[in-house]
From Swiss-Prot:
Residues 10-214 form the tr-type G domain. SUPFAM superfamilies: EF-Tu/eEF-1alpha/eIF2-gamma C-terminal domain (SSF50465), P-loop containing nucleoside triphosphate hydrolases (SSF52540), Translation proteins (SSF50447). Residues 81-84 are annotated as: G3. GTP hydrolase that promotes the GTP-dependent binding of aminoacyl-tRNA to the A-site of ribosomes during protein biosynthesis. GO terms for molecular function: GTP binding; GTPase activity; translation elongation factor activity. This is Elongation factor Tu. It is found in: Cytoplasm. Belongs to the TRAFAC class translation factor GTPase superfamily. Classic translation factor GTPase family. EF-Tu/EF-1A subfamily. Keywords: Cytoplasm, Elongation factor, GTP-binding, Hydrolase, Magnesium, Metal-binding, Nucleotide-binding, Protein biosynthesis. It is an enzyme of class 3 (hydrolase). Residues 19-26 are annotated as: G1. It catalyses: GTP + H2O = GDP + phosphate + H(+). PANTHER family: ELONGATION FACTOR TU, MITOCHONDRIAL, ELONGATION FACTOR TU-RELATED.
C-alpha cells in the first residue's frame, strides 16, 4: 500500500516534557493527547501506550523516548516524553536535543528536585530556547501560599540557569485529574471541566511563549543518526532528527564519523510512517540509503551534504562541571582524565589534555561547579563543528556539559 503523504499546513514545532522522575511527565503527555483528541487534533494515547518500551514496564520508569504528535489551532507538534530518571540521562540528552521548547513538569507537592535542576541545565546546554512550566498535582495542595512559594523557587532556579525566570509562564493543574475526566468522557470540550481547561491553558502558553523555531533550512543538510534498521527488499534506513538543511530523494549525501567518510544516494524519506519527497530541518525522519548495509552505519554518525562537515578528534570547549548536588562528581579531576563525550547521539571516549582558565593560565585540578576551558582528544573521529553542544559522562551519569569553542584537528 502506498503511504499517505504528510501534509504541511501549520508550522511544525518539536517539544517535550522534562522534569524529575514521578512528577507526572508521562501522565501529562497522555492528558494532552486525550484533550486535543476531542477536537480531532490528536490521536488519544493512554499512559501505558506512551510508557510502552518493555524496560519501562518492568521498572515503572520511562526509559526510552516516546514520540506523540498533535495539533493546536496554530501549530503541529511532535512531542517527546523524555526519561526522568538519572540513570537514563543519556536519553534525556538525545531527547532534549530534539526540542524547540519544553514543558518542565514540576510536582507542586515536591517542588524543584535534583533532576529538575539537572534537566533545566541540560535544556540550556542542548540549546532548548524556551521552557513553559506545568506545576502538576495542584489537586493535592491545600495551601495556596505554599504553591506561591514553589512557584517563586522555580522562577529563581530558572533565572540561575539563564532562562527568563520572571516571564516564563507557569500553569497550575493536574495531569491525572484531566486524564481521568477525558477517560470517562473523551468528548469533553474546553469550558466543560476546570482540569481539562488547565491543559488548554498550558497549550495556549506553549503556542504563544515557545517561539516558532528558526529553522536552519538554508544551511547544508545534516542529520545525526539515532537508529538504523533494514527494510527487506528496500535497503537500509537511518533515523534521526534533521538538524539543518533539506534532503530530497535522489540527493547524494556523505556518511561522516567513526569510520572513513563515504557517499551514498537517498532513495526514500519517511516521517510518521508517511512518505515525503523531501525532509527538512526539524523533521524526525527515516532516510533510505542506496548500497549501504546495516553494518556500515551506526548511531553517532551523521548524514550530511558532501563537504559540509568533517570528522575531527581534537577540539577546545567551554565546559561546566556539575556539582554533586546536580548529580555530578564529588571529587576533582586532573589533566589526563578520560571520560565519555556525548556528541549528538553517542558517547565517544576522549582524554582531556589540558584545562585552561579564563585568563589563559593552565589549571591542574578542576572541581565540581567549575566552568573551565578544556582541550580534548577523542579516540574516534566524529563530525564536530564550532558551537556544537556536548555532555561529559562517566559510568552512565552526566558530570559536565559544554560547547565546542574551537576545532584543533
Amino acid at each position: 500500500m502506498a503511504r499517505a503523504k504528510f501534509e504541511r499546513t501549520k508550522p511544525h514545532v518539536n517539544i517535550g516534557t522534562i522534569g524529575h522522575v514521578d512528577h507526572g511527565k508521562t501522565t501529562l503527555t497522555a492528558a494532552i493527547t486525550m484533550t486535543l483528541a476531542a477536537l480531532g487534533q490528536a490521536v488519544a494515547k493512554g499512559y501505558d501506550q506512551i510508557d510502552n518500551a518493555p524496560e519501562e514496564k518492568a521498572r515503572g520508569i520511562t526509559i526510552n523516548t516516546a514520540h506523540v504528535e498533535y495539533e493546536t489551532a496554530n501549530r503541529h507538534y511532535a512531542h517527546v516524553d523524555c526519561p526522568g530518571h538519572a540513570d537514563y540521562v543519556k536519553n534525556m540528552i538525545t531527547g532534549a536535543a530534539q526540542m524547540d521548547g519544553a514543558i518542565l513538569v514540576v510536582a507542586a507537592t515536591d517542588g524543584p528536585m535534583p533532576q529538575t535542576r539537572e534537566h533545566i541545565l541540560l535544556a540550556k546546554q542542548v540549546g532548548v530556547p524556551k521552557l513553559v512550566v506545568f506545576l502538576n498535582k495542584e489537586d493535592m495542595m491545600e495551601d495556596a501560599e505554599l504553591l506561591e512559594l514553589v512557584e517563586l523557587e522555580l522562577r529563581e532556579l530558572l533565572t540561575e540557569y539563564e532562562f527568563d525566570g520572571d516571564d516564563i509562564p507557569i500553569v497550575r493543574g493536574s495531569g491525572l485529574q484531566a486524564l481521568e475526566v477525558m477517560t470517562k468522557n473523551p468528548k469533553t470540550q474546553r469550558g466543560e471541566n476546570p482540569w481539562v481547561d488547565k491543559i488548554y491553558e498550558l497549550m495556549d502558553a506553549v503556542d504563544s511563549y515557545i517561539p516558532d523555531p528558526e529553522r536552519d533550512i538554508d544551511k547544508p543538510f545534516l542529520m545525526a543518526v539515532e537508529d538504523v534498521f533494514s527494510i527487506t527488499g528496500r535497503g537500509t534506513v537511518a533515523t534521526g532528527r534533521i538538524e539543518r538543511g533539506k534532503v530530497k530523494v535522489g540527493d547524494v549525501v556523505e556518511l561522516v564519523g567513526i569510520r572513513d567518510t563515504r557517499n551514498t544516494t537517498v532513495t526514500g524519506i519517511e516521517m510518521f510512517k508517511k512518505s515525503l519527497d523531501e525532509g527538512m530541518a526539524g523533521d524526525n525522519a527515516g532516510v533510505l540509503l542506496r548500497g549501504i548495509q546495516k553494518a556500515d552505519i551506526e548511531r553517532g554518525m551523521v548524514l550530511a551534504k558532501p563537504g559540509s562537515i568533517t570528522p575531527h578528534t581534537q577540539f577546545e570547549g567551554e565546559v561546566y562541571v556539575l556539582t554533586e548536588k546536580e548529580g555530578g562528581r564529588k571529587t576533582p579531576f586532573f589533566a589526563g582524565y578520560r571520560p565519555q563525550f556525548y556528541v549528538r547521539t553517542t558517547d565517544v571516549t576522549g582524554t582531556i589534555k589540558a584545562f585552561t582558565s579564563d585568563e589563559g593560565e593552565t589549571v591542574e585540578m578542576v572541581m565540581p561547579g567549575d566552568r573551565i576551558k578544556v582541550t580534548v582528544e577523542l579516540i574516534n573521529p566524529i563530525a564536530i563543528e564550532q558551537g556544537m553542544r556536548f555532555a561529559i559522562r562517566e559510568g552512565g551519569r552526566t558530570i559536565g556539559a559544554g560547547v565546542v569553542s574551537k576545532i584543533v584537528k
